[in-house]
């Protein structure tokens, strides 16, 4: 029996922890000020009305209201929060 591991097995076996990115509040959902709406890397979705952007590109609600996803042009999505449901 070998007393040393094979060269491949000691170099493998690492993986990073998941970062739990993605949409946290969906369209039509009620939110309060400060609720996280989307966790993302880069601005896949841009902040719209009443939505702030953190330094890690996290989008969060600035007011109490309802979430609405919109398209600002053909490609770019935005997320807004309105006080009354539209």
Swiss-Prot record:
It is found in: Plastid, Chloroplast. One of its GO terms (cellular component) is chloroplast. PROSITE patterns: RIBOSOMAL_L27. Keywords: Chloroplast, Plastid, Ribonucleoprotein, Ribosomal protein. Residues 1-27 are annotated as: Disordered. It comes from the Eukaryota. InterPro entries: Ribosomal_bL27, Ribosomal_bL27_CS. NCBIfam families: L27. This is Large ribosomal subunit protein bL27c. The gene is rpl27.
């Amino acid at each position: 029996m070998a007393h040393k591991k094979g060269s491949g097995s000691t170099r493998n076996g690492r993986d990073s922890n998941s970062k739990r990115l993605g949409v946290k509040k969906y369209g039509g959902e009620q939110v309060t000020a400060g609720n996280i709406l989307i966790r993302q890397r880069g601005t896949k979705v841009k902040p719209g009305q009443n939505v702030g952007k953190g330094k890690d590109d996290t989008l969060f609600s600035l007011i109490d209201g309802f979430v609405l996803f919109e398209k600002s042009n053909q490609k770019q999505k935005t997320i807004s929060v309105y006080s009354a449901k539209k």
